Amino acid sequence: MPTITSYFGFLLAASTITTALFIGLSKIRLI
């Protein structure tokens, strides 16, 4: 169970970072 939880947390963190980077690039391109 802890392994699945940690994997889910890692997946969530990775998706959050990817989204943040994508939004940052979009803002830079808009500017």
Swiss-Prot record:
Pfam families found in the cross-reference section: PetL
Recorded topology in the membrane: Single-pass membrane protein
One Gene Ontology cellular component annotation held by this UniProt entry: cytochrome b6f complex
Subcellular location: Plastid, Chloroplast thylakoid membrane
UniProt record, GO biological process: photosynthesis
UniProt keyword Transport, yes or no: yes
TM region positions: 4-26
Record keywords: Chloroplast, Electron transport, Membrane, Photosynthesis, Plastid, Thylakoid, Transmembrane, Transmembrane helix, Transport
InterPro entries the record matches: Cyt_b6/f_cplx_su6
Keyword Transport tagged: yes
Single GO term (MF): electron transporter, transferring electrons within cytochrome b6/f complex of photosystem II activity
Its biological purpose: Component of the cytochrome b6-f complex, which mediates electron transfer between photosystem II (PSII) and photosystem I (PSI), cyclic electron flow around PSI, and state transitions. PetL is important for photoautotrophic growth as well as for electron transfer efficiency and stability of the cytochrome b6-f complex.
Record-linked HAMAP family: Cytb6_f_PetL (MF_00433)
Family of the protein in this entry: Belongs to the PetL family.
Subunit structure: The 4 large subunits of the cytochrome b6-f complex are cytochrome b6, subunit IV (17 kDa polypeptide, PetD), cytochrome f and the Rieske protein, while the 4 small subunits are PetG, PetL, PetM and PetN. The complex functions as a dimer.
Protein name stated in the entry: Cytochrome b6-f complex subunit 6
